[in-house]
Design a protein with these regions (language model features):
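Conserved glycine-rich "GG(E/T)P / GGGxP" loop and the immediately following alpha-helix
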Residues: 5
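Histidine-acidic metal/acid-base catalytic patches
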Residues: 8-27, 33-114
Length: 114
């Protein structure tokens, strides 16, 4: 899992070096938004070949606040579509402080359908 890494290459280099299909990456999109100057969408594109799991939460980009997906600066619906396209087998953990707003957002955006 990425925590304070500023560039996706900091993670992809490790996975390329180890070169083992059993070692997969968890992308914490809130950490990317708070700690990296690289947009989350670029991280997904750069790391797609190694990604198997995502931690989903949002923030305003200044700190890791674990807000609901619809409450922050990440365009979460677009990001989840990108993740489903590039990493169709990936799983997701909703990592928020309050579940109700997150579930409401997922229902409104029809994230759980399909």
């Amino acid at each position: 899992e990425n925590v304070l890494e500023e560039q996706p290459e900091m993670m992809t280099e490790i996975f390329r070096e180890v070169d083992n299909p059993r070692l997969r990456m968890c992308l914490d999109v809130g950490h990317v938004n708070a700690y990296s100057p690289v947009p989350v969408e670029e991280w997904v594109s750069a790391c797609a070949g190694f990604l198997s799991h995502f931690h989903i939460h949002n923030n305003d980009g200044s700190q890791d606040t674990h807000c609901a997906p619809g409450e922050g600066t990440i365009s979460m619906a677009a990001l989840l579509r990108q993740a489903q396209t590039l990493c169709p087998e990936a799983t997701f953990t909703l990592e928020v402080l309050q579940a109700a707003p997150a579930v409401s957002w997922m229902l409104e955006e029809r994230i759980l359908e399909g």
